[in-house]
Amino acid sequence: MKTGIVTTLIALCLPVSVFATTLRLSTDVDLLVLDGKKVSSSLLRGADSIELDNGPHQLVFRVEKTIHLSNSEERLYISPPLVVSFNTQLINQVNFRLPRLENEREANHFDAAPRLELLDGDATPIPVKLDILAITSTAKAIDYEVEVERYNKSAKRASLPQFATMMADDSTLLSGVSELDAIPPQSQVLTEQRLKYWFKLADPQTRNTFLQWAEKQPSS
């Protein structure tokens, strides 16, 4: 099963589609959702970038950074989830630029009024719309896809309605299964579909790292 999935992933990515924009990831940014889809943390762990197509995009993320306290100790600051929407038309690279976050005062200020910039490859600011993602769920494990779908349907500052129903009906992910094929459990198909999606977005180095990791996993 393992070898089959890895082989399929390689086949799906050759030839590799031409992408117009490289999103450079920051070590201080925990990416949660991209364009309405939950990010595959196992695939993107350690990745330097993600390839995007031209057009509108939406990121949901948290800023995670070690800050210094007044007693000379340190703690990990984690921001509330943020939503940023932008357009990559005619842009070949997107880079995060965060404000200074070194102490408790700066962290509290960021919580109250978050701000950041996205820069293109020439360090020119890209127009963005930034907002805080208000979490409505009281569950311990937050389903960020559901929260983002709700946000995008509510006409908020950084809402992009076209991503509101991207994952609303998982049955659309099964449309490529032939009626003659032996259909595996739906959860397995959805997992593979999501994995293929993120594999296609990852940069070549990340793909290679993931394939090496997958080869070392025990067969199911």
From Swiss-Prot:
One Pfam family, short name please? DUF2057
User: InterPro entries, alphabetically?
Assistant: UPF0319
Q: Which UniProt keywords apply?
A: Signal
Q: Which residues form the signal peptide?
A: 1-20
NCBIfam families cross-referenced by the UniProt entry: CrliSynInhib, PRK03641.1
Q: What family is it from? A: Belongs to the UPF0319 family.
Specify the protein name.
UPF0319 protein YccT
